[in-house]
C-alpha cells in the first residue's frame, strides 16, 4: 500500500509503527456553526481511509478532535448571551448528526480541547523548560521557532523567508515576541472570554498546541498518519510538528495526508459570494449518501468542483450501483437451489479480478475514483449475467464481493425508506396537477403512497400542508 506523504512529496510504502495497527489523527472542525461541505470532504475521505485499513485487517485507532474554544465560538456566545460551552456543545451535537447521515463512522475518540487544558499546560511547561518556548511580560507564551532546526520541513518553506502569517489571535504584548515567526502557545484572557489558570497568566491555549497534546494523549508520541485539509499544512501542521517533536525528541507522524480544496461552480466557497452551503442545506435536496459518493468520485489530492449538475450525476451513478445490488438480492430471494453453472463460476472468477482491481486502486494512495470504476464493472457484470435461471449460489457470490467494497466507500446498499422534503414537495405538486386534471385516482394514489411512507397531507384554503407522522 502506497501513500502520498506531504512531508516527502512522494508516494511511500505504508509501514505501520506497530504491526497490524494504525494510529490516525485527523484535525476536526471548530464548532461555532453547522458544518459546511468543505468540512465534509476530509471527514468523508479519512473515514474511507479508516474503513479501508479495517477492510485490510488493521486495527485502527482513529482520533479526531473538536476545537471547542475559539474566537468565533466566543463571539457567537456573546451575540446570543450564553456561555461558550453552550454554543460548542450545540454544534458538536449537530455535527455528529450530519456525520452519521454521511455514514461517517464514530471516531475511536473525539477529544474536546477544553477537556485537555491540563495536558496543554504540561507540554507548554516542558517547552519552556527546554528553551523551545518563552514567556512574554504580559503572560503570553510563544514557541521559539528558531529553536527547532527542522521548521518548514512539512510545508517546504525556508524559515528565513517566512513572514508572520500564522492563524493566531492578536493579543496585547505581541511586541514581546523575539521573532515575528514565533507563534502563540498560551494567550492571556480578554474581558468576557473563558479562561483557565496557568503558571503564566489566566488565559487559554493557542490553536496549535491543542492538537499536539490530544494526539499525544490518545495515540502516543509517534503516530502513523496525520490528516487534514491542505489549508492546514501551514501553519497549523507545521507548528504541530515543531511542538510535538521539540517536546518528545521523536518524529511525530510518519505519513502526512492532505485533501485538496472544494470549489463551488469553479469558485472559492464564501458567504459573501452567496455560494456557501452547509451539509444540512444539501440534505434538503439530496440523501447525504449522494454527497459522500460525490466526494469520493475524484482523487482526494485533486481539487473538487461542486455543482448541481455534478451532484445529479453522482445521484444517478449511485442509483446505478444500488439498483444493481437490488437486482442481485431479487435473484437471491427467488431461491434457485440448482447447482451453480460453469458460466457462473467463470463470472465469479472475473468478479474476483475486479475486486483485486478495487484493492489495487485503494492501495495506490486511496484512489477512490478508480475504486468506484471497479465497482461499476462489477455491477455491469452482474446486470449482464443475471437472468431468470441464475442460481442463488451465484447471486450470493456476487453480493459477497460487491457489498464489502461498497462498505469500504461507506455506500449503504440497503435502501432507505425515509423520503426527502424535496421529494414530498414534488409529489404534492403532481397530486395537485392530477386533481386539476380531474384524475382523482392518481391523486388518491399519491396521497396513499405518501401515507405509507409516514407523510400525512392536509388540504387547506392556503394549499396543501404536510407533516411526518
Regions found by a protein language model. Name each.
Residues 62-63, 108-111, 226-228:
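Short catalytic-loop micro-motif centered on adjacent basic/acidic residues
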Residues 8-13, 17-105, 462-466:
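N-terminal, positively charged nucleic-acid-binding surface of large information/translation enzymes
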Residues 58, 132, 455:
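Short phosphate-binding/catalytic loops that engage adenosine nucleotides
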Residues 106, 136-138, 459-463:
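Short Gly/Ser/Thr- and Asp/Glu-enriched loop/turn motifs at secondary-structure junctions
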Residues 268, 275-469:
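Structural preference for alpha-helix termini/caps and helix-kink/transition segments
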Residues 1-32, 47, 118-329:
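Alpha-helical recognition segments enriched in aromatics with Gly/Pro capping
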Residues 66-70, 92-95, 105-120, 138-148:
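Short, glycine/charge-rich beta-strand/loop segments that flank catalytic centers
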Amino acid at each position: 500500500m502506497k501513500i502520498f506523504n506531504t512531508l516527502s512529496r512522494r508516494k511511500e510504502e505504508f509501514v505501520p509503527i506497530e504491526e497490524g495497527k494504525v494510529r490516525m489523527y485527523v484535525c476536526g472542525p471548530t464548532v461555532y456553526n453547522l458544518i459546511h461541505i468543505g468540512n465534509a470532504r476530509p471527514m468523508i475521505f479519512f473515514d474511507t481511509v479508516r474503513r479501508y485499513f479495517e477492510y485490510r485487517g488493521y486495527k485502527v485507532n482513529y482520533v479526531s478532535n473538536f476545537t471547542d474554544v475559539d474566537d468565533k465560538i466566543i463571539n457567537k456566545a456573546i451575540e446570543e448571551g450564553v456561555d461558550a460551552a453552550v454554543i460548542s456543545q450545540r454544534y458538536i451535537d449537530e455535527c455528529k448528526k450530519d456525520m452519521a447521515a454521511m455514514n461517517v463512522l464514530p471516531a475511536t475518540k473525539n477529544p474536546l480541547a477544553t477537556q485537555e487544558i491540563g495536558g496543554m499546560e504540561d507540554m507548554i511547561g516542558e517547552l519552556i523548560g527546554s528553551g523551545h518556548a518563552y514567556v512574554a511580560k504580559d503572560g503570553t507564551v510563544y514557541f521559539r521557532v528558531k529553536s527547532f532546526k527542522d521548521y518548514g520541513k512539512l510545508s517546504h518553506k525556508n524559515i528565513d523567508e517566512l513572514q508572520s502569517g500564522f492563524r493566531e489571535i492578536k493579543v496585547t504584548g505581541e511586541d514581546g515576541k523575539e521573532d515575528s515567526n514565533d507563534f502563540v502557545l498560551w494567550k492571556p484572557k480578554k474581558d468576557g472570554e473563558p479562561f483557565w489558570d496557568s503558571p503564566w497568566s489566566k488565559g487559554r491555549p493557542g490553536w496549535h498546541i491543542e492538537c499536539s497534546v490530544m494526539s499525544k494523549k490518545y495515540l502516543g508520541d509517534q503516530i502513523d498518519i496525520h490528516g487534514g485539509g491542505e489549508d492546514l499544512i501551514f501553519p497549523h501542521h507545521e507548528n504541530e510538528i515543531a511542538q510535538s517533536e521539540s517536546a518528545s525528541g521523536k518524529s511525530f507522524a510518519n505519513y502526512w495526508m492532505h485533501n485538496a480544496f472544494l470549489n463551488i461552480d469553479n469558485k472559492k466557497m464564501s458567504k459573501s459570494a452567496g455560494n456557501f452551503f452547509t451539509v444540512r442545506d444539501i440534505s434538503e435536496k439530496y440523501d447525504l449518501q449522494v454527497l459522500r459518493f460525490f466526494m469520493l468520485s475524484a482523487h482526494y489530492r485533486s481539487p473538487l468542483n461542486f455543482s448541481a449538475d455534478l451532484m445529479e450525476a453522482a445521484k444517478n451513478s449511485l442509483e446505478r450501483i444500488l439498483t444493481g445490488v437490488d437486482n442481485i438480492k431479487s435473484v437471491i430471494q427467488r431461491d434457485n437451489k440448482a447447482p451453480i453453472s460453469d458460466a457462473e463460476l467463470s463470472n465469479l472468477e472475473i468478479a474476483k479480478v475486479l475486486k483485486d482491481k478495487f484493492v489495487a486502486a485503494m492501495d495506490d494512495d486511496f484512489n477512490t475514483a478508480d475504486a468506484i470504476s471497479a465497482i461499476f464493472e462489477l455491477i455491469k457484470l452482474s446486470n449482464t449475467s443475471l437472468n431468470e435461471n441464475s442460481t442463488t449460489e451465484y447471486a450470493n457470490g456476487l453480493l459477497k464481493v460487491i457489498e464489502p467494497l461498497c462498505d469500504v466507500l461507506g455506500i449503504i446498499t440497503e435502501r432507505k425508506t425515509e423520503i426527502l422534503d424535496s421529494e414530498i414537495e414534488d409529489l404534492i405538486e403532481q397530486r395537485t396537477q392530477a386533481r386539476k386534471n380531474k384524475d382523482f385516482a392518481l391523486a388518491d394514489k399519491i396521497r396513499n403512497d405518501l401515507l405509507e411512507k409516514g407523510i400525512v397531507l392536509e388540504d387547506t384554503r392556503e394549499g396543501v400542508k404536510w407533516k411526518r407522522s
